[in-house]
């Protein structure tokens, strides 16, 4: 059964081909699919009965997003790109990182391939942006195997491990001719610009030769590299055979709001997109021209070889400022892509307008219901607190902020408790309230209109003690009460901590429920991070030869003991760790993992 919010969105779906992205309660994309008719396909998830994995997927969907395309074929190709980009749980279980990194070929005598997020004017060659770290790493590792440059610090007097693996040209122990580097770099650039035919042909010839020489392991590696090209490059093209890196901008204007869509075309495929919505003062054309120029003035943004815009945009001004050709395609695939960006801009804006009324009830309207029920002045900002610990260990507190009924995650705060060493609601509350509002007073920052505590009268009285007696602040404080089923029930408020009832079907009740769930989630999540870090540190500290510096290196690189135990000796030694210590780490963690998987049965007396 779809929620009221989803029912509104389902009613807005177009009967066009495209892709849909299902999201869970944390706004994570958990599934990407395609459809000839988005309206029929997406509605089928919520209007039909399901079993197994589909039923599990539907139970986790709280929101969705769509991208319309011109044809079903485009939808199919775009689906592949989106799955590769987002790594959704219900498509592929592998998830590795976020962000938009670039592959860099350094400008050195012995150049190397690197993954970077900072773009500098250092004469290096940058290719990207990639949709995520996973996609960039896969591409870079492929290039390091097929077209190696330097993969070691260099000049160490002996061949490095990567040289023996065929992934380094040998700057570690000899002088590599510049011509050899130049040849490799030309091949790398050609591949990154979408010209993969030569690489595939070369790999096929090498695979056949290795098989003929009965070097079957090497032939298998080469076969996997060919499959990488087929799976992640060739199948991800979106119609065009033109590999020119280009960005496409289009817009839709209505009721004083401008919707902008940006498509990033790299290696002849839609690498990623950005969408923006904001109210405008000038004409849409002027606003878009200004937006484009500012867009490329941001840090770590590489200019494409070509920018496509609608005909109404002033090409000359943008070209002059950015020194990049700006064109309006008249026919063919490029015109289709420009129109696709415009259609998506329109769809996003129309959806916003139709959801505004519903959103208003859930945000500012819900906030007013709460303040009216408490009998306090109307306000905008709520701050809520919760504590978390395990048997009095690793005590933490967390605060979430909701403004006009919406979470503002930039204002969230985490607190490691410093004066409390055991489970004590009063002491924990006193410390976190002193730290939070003492800081706001010192910085002359605005105070919230309401404070909510995920607890009863003990926490509320502690808050009032600090605010009123120590800081002379008079901020309304209420406690969020749960019923026997651990669900939001009422609010506690006033000098006598009386129960304030909220209609369970009201938006105000839903907002309190959201705040209570969110602050609990945030506190639990932070506690797990702290507890896991302490647990990891203690496990590593017990290994002979591992001191604080080595421990921190390992945690920064791998993040968990599981990943450390799965790492090769070479990967551990890359951190500057000696072979003996690396071997001890590897053996110790492997033994611990084996003990967890196959615990010994106690012997009977």
From Swiss-Prot:
GO terms for biological process: nucleotide-excision repair; SOS response. Pfam families: GIY-YIG, HHH_5, UVR, UvrC_RNaseH, UvrC_RNaseH_dom. It is found in: Cytoplasm. Residues 15-92 form the GIY-YIG domain. Signal peptide: none annotated. Residues 197-232 form the UVR domain. GO terms for cellular component: cytoplasm; excinuclease repair complex. SUPFAM superfamilies: C-terminal UvrC-binding domain of UvrB (SSF46600), GIY-YIG endonuclease (SSF82771), RuvA domain 2-like (SSF47781). InterPro entries: GIY-YIG_endonuc, GIY-YIG_endonuc_sf, GIY-YIG_UvrC_Cho, RuvA_2-like, UVR_dom, UVR_dom_sf, UvrABC_protein_C, UvrC. It comes from the Bacteria. Keywords: Cytoplasm, DNA damage, DNA excision, DNA repair, Excision nuclease, SOS response. GO terms for molecular function: DNA binding; excinuclease ABC activity. Interacts with UvrB in an incision complex. Belongs to the UvrC family. NCBIfam families: uvrC. The UvrABC repair system catalyzes the recognition and processing of DNA lesions. UvrC both incises the 5' and 3' sides of the lesion. The N-terminal half is responsible for the 3' incision and the C-terminal half is responsible for the 5' incision. This is UvrABC system protein C. It comes from Levilactobacillus brevis (strain ATCC 367 / BCRC 12310 / CIP 105137 / JCM 1170 / LMG 11437 / NCIMB 947 / NCTC 947). The gene is uvrC.
